[in-house]
């Protein structure tokens, strides 16, 4: 079984957008998840650079791409 894409939002509920306070709560929850992913990515990046591990650096780039996708999804959710 393939691991879920961390760049896909888990908490942005389209049906909650009818109630702004709930929608903002969903966005806040997703933003907190994004912060956790960023913390992990920064730890992984520091470790990869210390070891000069090209494969680990490539994995950090994938983590960064996932964060970019998640950031864009949160912005779309708030703006629409």
Show the residue positions of the predicted features.
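Cytosolic, long alpha-helical scaffolding segments
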Residues: 1-80
């Amino acid at each position: 079984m393939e691991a879920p894409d961390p760049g896909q939002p888990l908490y942005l509920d389209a049906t909650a957008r009818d109630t702004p306070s709930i929608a903002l709560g969903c966005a806040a929850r997703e933003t907190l998840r994004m912060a956790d992913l960023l913390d992990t990515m920064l730890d992984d990046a520091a470790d990869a650079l210390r070891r000069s591990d090209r494969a680990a650096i490539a994995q950090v780039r994938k983590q960064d791409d996932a964060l970019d996708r998640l950031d864009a999804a949160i912005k779309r959710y708030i703006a629409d």
